[in-house]
Regions:
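Intrinsic-disorder/low-complexity regions
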Residues: 1-2, 16, 25, 41, ...
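N-terminal acidic leader/helix
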Residues: 4-38
Length: 78
């Protein structure tokens, strides 16, 4: 993959491929992931498209977060 798609987080210090991440805007969902030992590779401030207000965007590694995502979809995470 081209280096232009790799980022290094100023928050976590982790390097990651942007195409191998998922964006989570739901704070409850992000907290549930972290409660289950899946931590974001990056966190950024963005603008919510609907409200126009600032929001946090949590970037998680797609593979690392797959199991907790499945549990989230099945209402198995709190």
């Amino acid at each position: 993959m081209d280096d232009q798609f790799y980022r290094k987080s100023t928050v976590t210090g982790r390097s990651y491929d942007v195409f191998k991440t998922v964006k989570i805007l739901n704070i409850q969902q992000a907290c549930s992931y972290m409660d289950n030992d899946v931590f974001p590779v990056d966190i950024k401030v963005s603008i919510d498209q609907r409200s126009g207000k600032k929001c946090l965007v949590f970037y998680f590694d797609r593979e690392e977060s797959k199991d907790v995502y499945d549990k989230w979809c099945n209402y198995e995470l709190k």
